[in-house]
Amino acid sequence: MRIHVTSRTSVSFLVGALLIGLVGGVVAQPQPDAKTYAANPALLIDAYRHVEVASVSDALEQLYNKRSFMTHRIHAISDGKIAGFAVTVQMDKAEGSAPSAVTPMQAAIDTAPKDSVYVMVVQDGDDIAGIGGLMATAMNARGFSGAVIDGGVRDVAYLKKIAFPVYASGIVPSTSVGHYRATQAVPVTAGGVRVSPGDIVVADADGVVAVPKDIAAEVLVKAQALDQTEHSMYGYIEKLRSLEEAVQRFGRL
């Protein structure tokens, strides 16, 4: 390839570009498309870790007119970003049941792959601890991204000590053993949102969102675009000191 340079400025620009590419090793790469993400689950989850949960929620609403966010009751108990594939457990009341009745909630942990998110629904469970320190330790050791419990949790000081992200409806010292029966790998309704095994679950300080697995790649690409637009607006707003002008220019609020 022959390059025609017409000025000293052009030479400087060309040398600078070459230095960035060859010496710095920084070359802009095109962002993967939905098809690429759909074919690579690890890439998909890694990308979901870097988008804001609010943008994921907006993407689902704009693309499918679908509510995907869990009620504000489900909030961070042990802070941290969550992004992974749902492993689901339903806990139903079974007063006086044998301890073995909750064995499936343990099996769900021990058979789950890395980057899973433990999603448990405890029937009338605001005053029942669905998980505690032992279960969180096992999840953490197996590489879970975090846990989302429609119910209570306990051993909170330890959850924070090991920095394992947990979102739940509250904190309570009780146990489910002897009071509940567990079923694993079934669709559940957590915080008002239907979650099936393998769906994408993301959570941050803004809340929790579940994305159906068959549309997860498309939703991700839309969320990335929304993130990019919003982040571009911050400096524009600060410079012009006008929200209205920024909204007119970027078309996002």
Describe each model-derived feature in a short phrase.
Residues 1, 26-28:
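Intrinsic low-complexity/disordered segments
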Residues 2-15:
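Bacterial N-terminal signal peptides that target proteins for export
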Residues 12-24:
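Bacterial N-terminal signal peptides
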Residues 29-197, 211-253:
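Feature captures the catalytic cores and cofactor-binding loops of soluble hydro-lyases/lyases
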Residues 207-209:
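Channel- or pocket-lining gating/hinge segments that regulate access to a cavity or pore
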